[in-house]
């Protein structure tokens, strides 16, 4: 199994929008990364993302570029300060490649 870790794109300020969706710059940056991954012929069928808007949008952009039929899955335990134990337990049972779109510091804990 290959595991791809992706931090969400730049989000708008909480002051501007409490849901913190991707900013226009964030959308553009993620689209560039998605096109790079497509040209690299990355094959991933499942994309886990946190329930937060910026991670969901990042996962959608990447999935649509590299695997339009891919499976997007929101996981409650991928938010910034969540413990990694549930993710580690799930990863230990997987055989298929997976992309996780989440946040710091959560992603740093997986290294």
Question: What residue ranges belong to the model's regions?
Answer:
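Active-site-adjacent alpha-helix immediately C-terminal to a catalytic or transition-state-stabilizing loop
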Residues: 88-111
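Active-site-proximal alpha-helix that buttresses catalytic centers in soluble enzyme cores
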Residues: 2-82, 107
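A general, composition-driven signal for non-globular sequence regions
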Residues: 1-2, 97
